[in-house]
Amino acid sequence: MAIGKRLKKAREGIDRTKLYPLDEAVKMVKERAVSKFDETIEVALNLGVDPRHADQMVRGVVMLPNGTGRTVRVGVFARGAKADEAKAAGADVVGAEDLVEQVQAGNINFDRCIATPDMMPLVGRLGKVLGPRGMMPNPKIGTVTMDVAGAVKGAKGGSVEFRVEKAGIVQAGVGKASFSEEKLVENIKALADAVTKAKPTGAKGTYIQRVAVSSSMGPGVKVEPGSVH
């Protein structure tokens, strides 16, 4: 079946003008995730912020109670004992100058990036490579840290970084279609709570304005914003 026809069929039964309670929306999305692979369940939160203003930037990290369901490759910039700690904690790639050279050459064999503070002068050179991918280590979200073992375990265990995009939207994967409805609802509420706690001082009016849930290949379902808390 062509993707267009499949999506059209999946949209049947969804009222595009209606806002559904979160649990009902998740059920509808799961029922329509019928691809041969285990689709990712994604959430989009439209926020009442303008991220072009520094005092309206939203970013942070949340530990999803039920994990993400995906295998996350973690790269760590560290030396000596901290490099050993990172390896012992399960980091996939660990290095210093050698890892910087690999990344500069375009060999990025990780999805998340962690660094010890002393490595940042080196890692700072990679801003043009890691920045656009949203992978630049940042102390505000715990990826520049001396606790590399804790950061690696968190990244592997279900921590999700979020950052508002230009249009004022936070998007994140919150699990897989194979997850139970209850686990997906718990993960979505954890994300919404973390985004709420990250509300910037410059935000005025309604903060979480619109919410939608979808699967990788399926249609979006609009959610009552009040039901995500």
UniProtKB/Swiss-Prot annotation:
The keyword Plastid does not apply. One of its GO terms (biological process) is translation. The keyword Repressor applies. Gene3D superfamilies: 3.30.190.20, 3.40.50.790. One of its GO terms (cellular component) is cytosolic large ribosomal subunit. Pfam families: Ribosomal_L1. Keywords: Repressor, Ribonucleoprotein, Ribosomal protein, RNA-binding, rRNA-binding, Translation regulation, tRNA-binding. InterPro entries: Ribosom_uL1_bac-type (IPR005878), Ribosomal_uL1 (IPR002143), Ribosomal_uL1-like (IPR023674), Ribosomal_uL1/biogenesis (IPR028364), Ribosomal_uL1_3-a/b-sand (IPR016095), Ribosomal_uL1_CS (IPR023673). It comes from the Bacteria. One of its GO terms (molecular function) is structural constituent of ribosome. Belongs to the universal ribosomal protein uL1 family. NCBIfam families: rplA_bact. Part of the 50S ribosomal subunit. Binds directly to 23S rRNA. The L1 stalk is quite mobile in the ribosome, and is involved in E site tRNA release. Protein L1 is also a translational repressor protein, it controls the translation of the L11 operon by binding to its mRNA. This is Large ribosomal subunit protein uL1. The lineage of its organism: Bacteria, Pseudomonadati, Pseudomonadota, Alphaproteobacteria, Hyphomicrobiales.
